Regions:
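A conserved ligand/cofactor-binding region detector
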Residues: 1-427
Length: 427
C-alpha cells in the first residue's frame, strides 16, 4: 500500500548538511491499495501487469468524534477514500467536482509514481539511472501532475538536489497530445491546486520560475519578439491558473501528436511557440489498433478467411495482410468476402433486436458512428443528415434510394449539456 497526502501545509527546516528539508504537515491521507491484472501477450511467453488502485482510509471510524456528537468527522476519512474511487472523471462543472477530479488524478498518480520508484530501487542501486529503465508516457494532460510528483519523490524521499531530480524527470516523462481543443488542455485554479497539493504546487512554481527565466534569456535580445506575450502563452502558471499542457511540454523529452496533420497543426499553430523553442521534442505517432483485438478476436470469420488466403503471419506482422491485394479482382474472393460481411451483419441485427427491440434489415447499408459524443465529433451533423434524408423520402417517395440503417453509439460527459441534448435528439 502507498500513502497519498492531501492538503495541509509545508514546513521547511535545514538539516545537519545545510540542506533544506520540506515536510508536509496537517494533511489528510488516503491509503492506496494495489490490485494487479495480468495482461497476457499473444503467443510470446510474456505476461505484463496492469496495476490499478483502490482507496482506503488510513484511519477508519473515529469513535471519539462520534461519542462527542461530531458524526461527520467520525466518518470523514472513510468518505474521503470512498469518494475518490466511486466515479471516474466526475462532473467538474462545479467547484466540488473540480476538487474531486484533482484528488482523483493525484491519488492514482502519486501511488503509481511511488510504486515505480520503489520497484526500480528494489532491483537497482543508482536512482540517477532511473530514466534508463522507466518512462512515464503522459496520455493527455490528466496525468501531468506526475512530473511534479516524481520531482517530489526524488527530492524529498531520496534527497536529490533540484538539478539531479530535474535531469531524471525530463528524461523520464513524455507527453501525448490527443486534441487541439483548448478545453482539453487542462487548467487548474491556483487556489484549488495549492490548497489541495501544497508541496506539489511549490515544485510547479519553481519549474515555472526557471522556465520563465529561460524564455527571457532566449528571447530578450531577439528583434520583433514580444517576450511578455511569449510568457503569457508559454508559462505554466499564469492568470491564476496552472496550465498542465505547458508543464508537460516543458518537463519532458518528447511531445507527440496522434496523426500527421494533427502534429503539423500542433507545430505550426497551437503549440508553435513551444515548437520554436524545443523543435527536437516534437514528433508524430499515428494512432492505430491491434489486429489481434479488432480482427482476430472481434471478427473470427474474416480472420479465418484472411489466414486461408495469406497464412497467419499477419497476426503478429500486420503488413503481411497487404498480400491480399492479389485477390482484389478475384470474383470468388470478392463473393466470399461479401458473404462474411453479410453473416456479421445478420449477427449484429440479431443483437440489436435482442437488446434494443429494433428490427433492422441486414441487407441495408450499415452507417455506423461509434465514438464519444462531442460537438467536434459531429454526431449532430450526422443526425441532421438522417433527418434530411427522411424528409426527402417523405416528399419524394419515388426516389431510387438504397436502404440504409444508421447506428449511433456514444456516451456524453456528465456535465456536457449539448452532448446530452444530441443523444436526446438521436433517440
Amino acid at each position: 500500500a502507498k500513502i497519498v497526502k492531501f492538503g495541509g501545509y509545508v514546513s521547511v527546516h535545514t538539516d545537519e548538511n545545510g540542506r533544506n528539508v520540506f515536510t508536509q504537515e496537517g494533511y489528510q491521507s488516503v491509503k492506496a491499495i494495489p490490485f494487479d491484472f495480468p495482461i497476457v501477450g499473444y503467443g510470446n511467453g510474456i505476461v505484463n501487469t496492469l496495476r490499478i488502485w483502490d482507496a482506503e482510509p488510513v484511519e477508519c471510524f473515529q469513535l471519539d468524534s462520534f461519542d462527542k456528537g461530531d458524526y461527520q468527522k467520525a466518518v470523514e476519512q472513510e468518505n474521503l477514500a470512498r469518494n475518490i474511487v466511486e466515479v471516474l472523471y466526475p462532473n467538474d462543472n462545479h467547484y466540488a467536482g473540480k476538487e474531486l477530479r484533482l484528488k482523483q488524478q493525484y491519488f492514482f498518480i502519486s501511488a503509481s509514481v511511488q510504486e515505480a520508484v520503489e520497484k526500480y530501487m528494489r532491483k537497482h542501486d543508482d536512482i540517477h539511472k532511473f530514466y534508463e529503465k522507466v518512462t512515464f508516457q503522459l496520455n493527455d494532460t490528466h496525468p501531468t501532475v506526475a512530473i511534479a510528483e516524481l520531482m517530489r519523490v526524488l527530492m524529498d524521499d531520496y534527497y536529490l538536489t533540484w538539478e539531479e531530480a530535474w535531469e531524471i524527470t525530463t528524461k523520464t516523462c513524455a507527453y501525448t497530445n490527443h486534441t487541439i481543443m483548448a478545453e482539453a488542455l487542462e487548467k487548474w485554479p491556483i487556489e484549488l491546486f495549492s490548497r489541495l497539493l501544497p508541496r506539489i504546487y511549490q515544485i510547479v512554481e519553481e519549474i515555472n520560475r526557471r522556465f520563465v527565466l529561460d524564455i527571457q534569456q532566449k528571447y530578450s535580445n531577439v528583434p520583433g519578439v514580444d517576450v511578455q506575450e511569449k510568457i503569457r502563452k508559454m508559462a505554466i502558471i499564469y492568470d491564476g491558473q496552472v496550465k498542465m499542457a505547458n508543464m508537460a511540454i516543458v518537463s519532458g523529452y518528447s511531445v507527440n501528436g496522434v496523426a500527421r496533420l494533427h502534429t503539423e497543426i500542433l507545430e505550426k499553430q497551437e503549440l508553435k511557440d513551444f515548437y520554436e523553442m524545443f523543435p527536437e521534442r516534437f514528433n508524430n505517432k499515428t494512432n492505430g489498433i491491434t489486429q489481434r483485438r479488432f480482427l482476430l478476436h472481434a471478427n473470427p470469420l474474416l480472420a479465418d478467411w484472411v489466414t486461408a488466403h495469406v497464412g497467419d503471419d499477419w497476426i503478429t506482422d500486420l503488413p503481411q495482410i497487404s498480400r491480399l491485394k492479389v485477390y482484389a479482382d478475384d470474383k470468388k474472393a470478392q463473393q466470399e468476402f461479401m458473404n462474411i460481411k453479410y453473416q456479421n451483419k445478420v449477427r449484429l441485427a440479431k443483437y440489436i433486436l435482442e437488446h434494443n427491440g429494433i428490427e433492422v434489415d441486414p441487407r441495408s447499408i450499415f452507417d455506423v458512428q461509434v465514438k464519444r459524443l462531442h460537438e467536434y465529433k459531429r454526431q449532430l451533423l450526422n443526425i441532421l443528415h438522417v433527418m434530411h434524408l427522411y424528409n426527402e423520402l417523405k416528399e419524394h417517395p419515388e426516389l431510387d434510394f438504397y436502404p440504409r440503417t444508421f447506428i449511433f453509439g456514444a456516451k456524453a460527459a456528465a456535465g456536457y449539456r449539448n452532448a446530452k441534448l444530441t443523444i436526446k435528439l438521436i433517440n
